[in-house]
């Protein structure tokens, strides 16, 4: 659906149009129990669609995201396309309230 597709008559009198429009800066907050899998659900699609990404890994296991950043660099992704911020609750609050972050993906519970 990220290719600008059109689906006619998805419901009575309803057509579906999708547009590939980058949002700008997006962010993700990952849980401690899936420190690589959840970020891999989040940032690849976002950067493929033309956005930059800020990833906040769990402060309990920050190393997995560092490995992913190294793999991104090796694959030729330019510096600054995916960024990592470390921290706890205050960092998440900052991400959620920052006016330049246009979309946020969360995985986790209370």
Regions inferred by a protein language model and the residue ranges of each:
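Rossmann-like NAD(P) dinucleotide-binding subdomain of oxidoreductase/dehydrogenase enzymes
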Residues: 2-110
């Amino acid at each position: 659906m990220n290719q600008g597709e059109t689906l006619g008559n998805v419901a009575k009198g309803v057509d579906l149009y999708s547009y590939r429009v980058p949002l700008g800066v997006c962010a993700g907050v990952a849980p401690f129990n899936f420190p690589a899998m959840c970020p891999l659900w989040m940032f690849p699609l976002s950067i493929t669609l033309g956005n930059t990404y800020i990833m906040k890994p769990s402060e309990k296991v920050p190393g997995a995201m560092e490995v992913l950043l190294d793999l991104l660099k090796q694959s030729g992704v330019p510096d600054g396309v995916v960024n990592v911020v470390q921290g706890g609750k205050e960092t998440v609050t900052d991400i959620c309230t920052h006016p330049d972050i246009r979309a946020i993906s969360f995985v986790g519970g209370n």
